[in-house]
Amino acid sequence: MAVFFGGLAYGINNFKLYDLYKAYFVKSSFIEENYVEPKETKLIFPEKKRNVIYIYLESMENSYMSKDLGGMEEVNLIPKLTQLANEGYSFSDTDNKFVGPKTPVGSQWSLASMTNQMTGLPMKVPGDNNTYGSSGNFFPGAWTFGDVLNNEGYEQTVMVGANAKFGGLEYLFSSHGNYKVMDYNFAIENGFLPNNYKQFWGFEDDKLYKFAKDEITRLYNTGKPFNMTLETADTHMPGYVSPQIENVFNNQYANAIYYSQNEVYKFVQWIKQQPFYDNTTIILIGDHLSMCSDFFKNVNKNYNRTQYNLIINPSPELEISKTCFNNRIWSNYDMYPTVLAAMGVKIDGNRLALGTNLFSNEPTVFERYGYDYVNKELAKKVSDEVDGFLKELSRSEIISKSLDNYGYILLVDNIDEAG
């Protein structure tokens, strides 16, 4: 799972010297000028609040489709996800339905992607270690997707097959929304697995879906609206070889992708058979682009690789612009208001943080200013003028110092070491 190991190394190793210089010394007030405070934005939930099942699919790309669908493969590696895409809503930056979001600064690994979609903000890589934040101190001033739902009485669980403490994922979800965090350690401690059990990063996706079915059933039986968030792992490079996997292709990663997409499909079909489905919206999104460089070594460098994205069974009350799906320049930030809108939430102004409700006619920040310009601004250090904004956002002196060091990222455990 890239959030825990490979993604961090990838982020640091690909952080070029000039980018590092910009992050520390070249200033920008872009966030200050374009940030919409979610906590101050009027949100109207439907009388019957919808459940949401939010699935981050490790390294899942549209590029895995066949060339006739706009992918890079001779044979479609994700036929079941392609089938599902015809049942729901996807957003594309071309006329082709199967082209997803841009990948701006601070969104290239799993934890960053989750943070983007939860907060509507980018995330930068600190230089100290794998500890992003601490309990109660992960973006402490941000009002996130999880905070919004928690404030509306939702029961929330996040489930991952790895150790959620590594990288700070646990802190993101426990600090914002009072999520129940079910990870590898939780599974061992609660007898879901033998004490010595370890596959890949912790436990494999076959077990993730099994445990998730039980937890979703428990959430439904509370009688409260619920949010079940999952992060898969089997398609992290080099690809986990499940005992049930079929060797359809002469490539381990291709087989892992093919097997994974089929398991996702079966899980979605299970959800559709449950009594809560009519009032439940499903989100499927690739967390980031794959880091398995060998798998893409023969791909044209100009090919536009993008994350798979799909919204299934949105609220019947959702207002949809006829022109909202194609030729959109968007990113993970936009998922924050877009998912809420899919759940039937009315958002005053259709914007939260740096994100835009993609179902609306409101332009994203990238559409308004241009992708290259926005990406360059987000790579810079925050300006001195934004100091008051940051203090209000963070509500603590120490996070303001961390933000000053890294530019709007988050609190790390040791500010002196981080700086």
Residue ranges and their predicted role:
Residues 1-22:
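Transmembrane and membrane-interface helices of multi-pass
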Residues 21-38:
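Short extracytoplasmic/periplasmic juxtamembrane "stem" segments immediately C-terminal to an N-terminal membrane anchor
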Residues 38-50, 54-419:
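Solvent-exposed soluble domains appended to multi-pass membrane proteins
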